Amino acid sequence: MLSLYEKIKIRLIILFLLAALSFIGLFFIINYQLVSERAVKRADSRFELIQKNVGYFFKDIERSALTLKDSLYLLKNTEEIQRAVILKMEMMPFLDSVGLVLDDNKYYLFSRRANDKIVVYHQEQVNGPLVDESGRVIFADFNPSKRPWSVASDDSNNSWNPAYNCFDRPGKKCISFTLHINGKDHDLLAVDKIHVDLNWRYLNEYLDQISANDEVLFLKQGHEIIAKNQLAREKLIIYNSEGNYNIIDSVDTEYIEKTSAVPNNALFEIYFYYPGGNLLNASDKLFYLPFAFIIIVLLVVYLMTTRVFRRQFSEMTELVNTLAFLPDSTDQIEALKIREGDAKEIISIKNSIAEMKDAEIERSNKLLSLISYDQESGFIKNMAIIESNNNQYLAVGIIKLCGLEAVEAVFGVDERNKIVRKLCQRIAEKYAQCCDIVTFNADLYLLLCRENVQTFTRKIAMVNDFDSSFGYRNLRIHKSAICEPLQGENAWSYAEKLKLAISSIRDHMFSEFIFCDDAKLNEIEENIWIARNIRHAMEIGELFLVYQPIVDINTRAILGAEALCRWVSAERGIISPLKFITIAEDIGFINELGYQIIKTAMGEFRHFSQRASLKDDFLLHINVSPWQLNEPHFHERFTTIMKENGLKANSLCVEITETVIERINEHFYLNIEQLRKQGVRISIDDFGTGLSNLKRFYEINPDSIKVDSQFTGDIFGTAGKIVRIIFDLARYNRIPVIAEGVESEDVARELIKLGCVQAQGYLYQKPMPFSAWDKSGKLVKE
């Protein structure tokens, strides 16, 4: 026979299962429609992006062909033409081959082999055999005008050609873009026609990059599939009788099909298949949170209900049988109440347990008193006392004894304890009458001012009022205070603010008082936020580089550029580089940040220099902290990044930033020496503000020095003498000076008088990404 509790429990289980099944069914019906609609929207969005990317790819090929054409201007010698084409092909891995029809109708073919070696085939006579460099005949009676890339194209326009069989790669299709030389170009070029062939492997890899792992993407020309992404290469793709493609795999994935012509290139079609229709795979995981939440709520309600019933039936049964459980229920006041109908024996047991409970409370209060107050000083040890009393206070302060650990290490625990007792005695003498004093630990005390707030403020602001009591020079007192009313229940939050303020001066070597206002707290909090978030900011791309040109101060010709790091936070807006660079050095993050800046600067410089008209001696200046130069293998990593980007050492300048650090080690000078041997220039940034003393100046022997903007901006004031001294020093050592922060013509003229030849500043151009620079090599004026 089932008990009443068991019967109710069974009914609850049935009700819970019915509710859960109903909810699950309704959820999946609604969710399936939402998932399908969302999959279509995502497919449209993804396809739009892929259309643009594929269009950009073909546009890049066309631009590359034009770039190739530009490289052949004024070249008449066939050897020069060959070298120019090979050089360009080495920089364009997406091209498989390049063909030239010269103005004498002879044909040259530059073909990329499997090992990336570029092989040249040519004709000795018009329409004659096509031979390799050794004279071996590759194709007899080769007539360029009959090749598909020539036949299919209009002589007046540049155009893409349908896929055709490559003569030098049996079984492989070629796709060519043909460039016709017309008009004035015909007089400047020794070429009548150029065709470039796509690198199939590169195109396939590009489709892999722009598509997700679960998307099928391929390109079609006519009835030929000319390129596939990784998933398309793995799937079985069947062209059906309806003119569509079926994607066959082992799991019967449902795909949303999207097709269109390549933008501005109707010759090729894009086929895109986005996975959709699978509820478990396609649905956003966050969509299932409400479902999981309702199930959990139902389960919790069931467990709580059964627990309540179980407890009620248990108590009823136990009260009927025995009151033996009461000694184990000393904290359950409800169980000890005398109720009508209680037997005399039950009342006696409840009274006995109540007496035991009262005795326990008395012992607990005595114990709480012992653990809440320091028995020797009388100071409060437990903040719960302050919070529970919730008294009104007029101000709050904190006292920190620094250097106590050193005393203990040298003189022992007894001497340490002696100093702590003396400190507590002095604190009690000065503040006990007007403050509640809380001991956090032996060297940290919180003062909560009850009255006489002016006296309290005056006393706590006194510096060195404790120093003579200890007799140890390295012991120092750091104090801070907030002068505003507060309740005891909020005392802990004020204590945390004061601890934060004290932490900002923990390394100061003298006793100090810091008034803790909102501005100070905001500054400390911002520095902590920067330290915690700078790594994440670098990872998500909030840190980026801008470049300010360095110009000839007389002609204003651009001589180089300085890479400058900027941080625009989505949460806090623009973060000053003076702050986050300094903090990165303080927390040991400067090496990781510095290498990221070097990689980014060299990569962006490489891309910009390929498409811009820069002087041959253009110099990219990259700021490097002395902390980085203290690293053993800095020059090796710098060189590796330089070679990866194909840059020449004489196009780079390392600017050593003016950071004051405790020790310059032997690696600092070794790195400078190795970089200089390779041809990298060395400059001292912000000369005169930090690192640069005369000894280091001569040890580094820089190729140039930069005068900080704080000096140039005040050149007509007190800083003018410093600027003149710097220029005299540089002139004596025959070292060029670059003036930073030039913002007016008056300053520029004064610098010219001093012999300055290079400058940078907003007078010429503000810092901006290379993408915003004038590619002709001129300054950008807003």
From Swiss-Prot:
Disruption phenotype: Cells lacking this gene have a weak reduction in swarm size. GO terms for molecular function: cyclic-guanylate-specific phosphodiesterase activity. The chain crosses the membrane at residues 12-32, 286-306. The gene is pdeI. Coiled coil: none annotated. It is found in: Cell membrane. It comes from the Bacteria. InterPro entries: CHASE9 (IPR033418), Cyclic-di-GMP_PDE-like (IPR050706), EAL_dom (IPR001633), EAL_sf (IPR035919). One of its GO terms (biological process) is regulation of single-species biofilm formation. This is Probable cyclic di-GMP phosphodiesterase PdeI. CDD domains: EAL. It catalyses: 3',3'-c-di-GMP + H2O = 5'-phosphoguanylyl(3'->5')guanosine + H(+). Its EC number is 3.1.4.52. Its main location: membrane. GO terms for cellular component: plasma membrane. It is a multi-pass membrane protein. Keywords: c-di-GMP, Cell membrane, Hydrolase, Membrane, Transmembrane, Transmembrane helix. Residues 527-781 form the EAL domain. Phosphodiesterase (PDE) that catalyzes the hydrolysis of cyclic-di-GMP (c-di-GMP) to 5'-pGpG. Overexpression reduces biofilm formation. Cyclic-di-GMP is a second messenger which controls cell surface-associated traits in bacteria. Signal peptide: none annotated.
